[in-house]
Amino acid sequence: MIVLNDRIIPWQPTVIAGPKQAMLVTPETATMMIKKARRPLMVVGPLAKRQEVLEHTVKIIRHFDLPVVATADTYRALSEAGIESEPHGIVEITNLLKDPSWEGIRGEGQHDLVIFIGCIYYIASQGLSSLKHFAPHIKTLTICKTFHSNADASFPNMDDDEWFRYLEKMYAE
């Protein structure tokens, strides 16, 4: 009998990644990926507006001095928290990231690592799949509480308490 680890099963079972599936990462590995990146980018979705999630997200952004894209209606919440961000739809930013000649949010060149948090699962999955197949110049990392099989690296499925501990470890050095 085959036993599957429920921490690395896609949160929505219909999301089949194919032969290339995300690597399961710890907060320490995620932190190392961000530090190693030359031009990382944080994409913040509407699920990050929840106060506890927003607080952790803001601390991570400040800790790593990340340029930020606010998707959906997160722009206002980030602005009120003192975070500068560029408003883009998730589809729009995905299309920009696929273009190797795009100069990035700060005009310093294309991003080499994109970190996602708080994006709605089904749309994030499609964006991650698109980047996986059509943007080989970019690595993707999801620090959501659900495993995203189409990312290059992802946190496992977990409850809020464990997720908040994971996020806290990323900026509590």
UniProtKB/Swiss-Prot annotation:
Signal peptide: none annotated. Pathway: One-carbon metabolism; methanogenesis from acetate. One of its GO terms (biological process) is methanogenesis, from acetate. It holds the Pfam family CO_dh. Part of a complex that catalyzes the reversible cleavage of acetyl-CoA, allowing growth on acetate as sole source of carbon and energy. The alpha-epsilon subcomponent functions as a carbon monoxide dehydrogenase. The precise role of the epsilon subunit is unclear; it may have a stabilizing role within the alpha(2)epsilon(2) component and/or be involved in electron transfer to FAD during a potential FAD-mediated CO oxidation. Belongs to the CdhB family. HAMAP family: CdhB. Heterotetramer of two alpha and two epsilon subunits. The ACDS complex is made up of alpha, epsilon, beta, gamma and delta subunits with a probable stoichiometry of (alpha(2)epsilon(2))(4)-beta(8)-(gamma(1)delta(1))(8). This is Acetyl-CoA decarbonylase/synthase complex subunit epsilon. It comes from Methanothermobacter thermautotrophicus (strain ATCC 29096 / DSM 1053 / JCM 10044 / NBRC 100330 / Delta H) (Methanobacterium thermoautotrophicum). The gene is cdhB.
